[in-house]
Every structure is written in structure tokens, then in C-alpha cells.
Amino acid sequence: MEKLDNDIELLRNLKIEIHSLRKCFDNISDEMVLDNLKKTIIISEKIYKEVAVDSLKLNKVKNYIRFYLPTVNKVLERYIKFKDSKINNKEMVALYTKIEEFLPKAYESFKKIHDSLFTSEIIDIDSEIKIMLKEMGL
């Protein structure tokens, strides 16, 4: 029962983080940031769909749910706050650039996490095909 409660909590947190990403979307004007945010939302929704139906996959993305996605949200919230403050000194411009360079890397990392959810299935199917072909003498 405890595992089920933990799984439900993880899924709830994932859904909350995705919702927070969507809220950030409405407050960003930079097209490059918006594009990366949109891709991050889409891949996060795909991860959610996969782990919602397979608790074994959910275990593979705990760090993503507990740390990576919340960190991206915090970075975006601060980016929005600083952009709204209209501070454009040298340090802030460097920070904006760093954040803008970070977002595509975060997306690529999330994409790898999503892809890794299918690794064992790919190996299983490949093994089944090899065994069947061997048994058929092919």
C-alpha cells in the first residue's frame, strides 16, 4: 500500500510540475525560450503518459520528477521574475544567456529520459525476434 501511495504522490508531483511549466509559458516573450519550453512540456507530458500506466517505468524517473523538473521550473520562474524587473546590467544579461543556453540542454536530457523508458521493451522484442528466427531455422 505504501508503494502505491508513493507512486500516486510521484504522479501528482509530475502533473503539478508540468502545470507549472505551462504557467511559465504565458509569461515569456523570447521565442527561443518559448520553443524550448514548449518542447519540454511536450516531452514531459509524454513521460507522464508512460509512467502513469507502468509503475516500473515510474521508478526510472524519480530523479526527473523530484529534482530535474522542479529545478527547470525554478530557473524559469526566476528568469521571468528578472525579465519582468527590466534589469539589464552585465550580470543579468549573462544570467539570461546562461538560462537560454541551459533550456535546450534540459530538453535533450528529458528526451533521453523518455527514450530510456523503452530500452527494456526494445531489448525484449529484439530477443523474441532472434529466438523465433532461430527456431524457424532462419
Question: Which residues does each predicted region cover?
Answer:
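Membrane-proximal, non-transmembrane interface segments of integral membrane proteins
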Residues: M1-A52
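Soluble C-terminal extramembrane regulatory/interaction domains of multi-pass membrane proteins
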Residues: D35-L138
